[in-house]
Amino acid sequence: MSDLKSLATKFASDHESRKLLVLPTVWDTWSAGLVEEAGFSGLTIGSHPVADATGSSDSENMNFANYMAVVKKITSAVSIPVSVDVESGYGLSPADLIAQILEAGAVGINVEDVVHSEGKRVREAQEHADYIAAARQAADVAGVDVVINGRTDAVKLGADVFEDPMVEAIKRIKLMEQAGARSVYPVGLSTAEQVERLVDAVSVPVNVTAHPVDGHGAGDLATLAGLGVRRVTFGPLWQKWLADTSAQQLKGWA
């Protein structure tokens, strides 16, 4: 547990450093090893790429115990901090969720407000903040400074669900920050103007998803840094790029 506490403290400190963190999203020990060897200070595990790599599907369709077994293999294979995407929590209480990710060796979580196991119900803003607050409390009781990355799909869901998705996203990331999230993740941002509005709304790092080759709709890594972005992950995009590139190369051999 002492090593876990040290990793968590380092990860939390990295998030408070005001520097831009790039945390590539991995799915197995091979991809995790590549990230560590490349010199990154931490990594993220994505539910989507893990599901694709294990013959399952995303949206909380994986068996959680099996998922945590994958996480444990990855955390055992690297020496850098690992954060895991837990979607909306897989139906677990915040305390149980924190206990299980710590057991698997992770020191961060990404938790979203769309509950896939309940017909893709969107949690109310305060409900989601309360879930994050309870997870924060559970981590504090365990004595591990878990980095909670609070995700909202408000912008991604758009005007079909919210009258003003950007206003809703801002409300939600503020509540998540107040609840103890160390970073916030408003998915679906595609322009510099959107990114700036969200960055200006909170003091914690704002996470954006970027493509490892094509960057983000707002620009490349330097542009994102200039906009105030302090955390970048890849979601399923690195894995998809590898798959697409490999498929093109393999065609000549078929």
Spans of model-derived segments:
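Alpha/beta enzyme core
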Residues: 2-82, 86-236, 240-243, 247, ...
